[in-house]
UniProtKB/Swiss-Prot annotation:
Keywords: Carbohydrate metabolism, Glucose metabolism, Magnesium, Metal-binding, Mitochondrion, Oxidoreductase, Phosphoprotein, Pyruvate, Thiamine pyrophosphate, Tricarboxylic acid cycle
Catalytic activity: N(6)-[(R)-lipoyl]-L-lysyl-[protein] + pyruvate + H(+) = N(6)-[(R)-S(8)-acetyldihydrolipoyl]-L-lysyl-[protein] + CO2
Cofactor(s) demanded: thiamine diphosphate; Mg(2+)
Taxonomic source organism: Canis lupus familiaris (Dog)
Stated role: The pyruvate dehydrogenase complex catalyzes the overall conversion of pyruvate to acetyl-CoA and CO(2), and thereby links the glycolytic pathway to the tricarboxylic cycle.
PTM note: Phosphorylation by PDK family kinases inactivates the enzyme; it is reactivated by dephosphorylation.
Main location: mitochondrion
Protein known as: Pyruvate dehydrogenase E1 component subunit alpha, somatic form
First-tier enzyme category under EC: oxidoreductase
Amino acid sequence: XXDATFEIKKXDL
């Protein structure tokens, strides 16, 4: 996807 922040947040969880 184009949402890099979403991927980072998911990993942060």
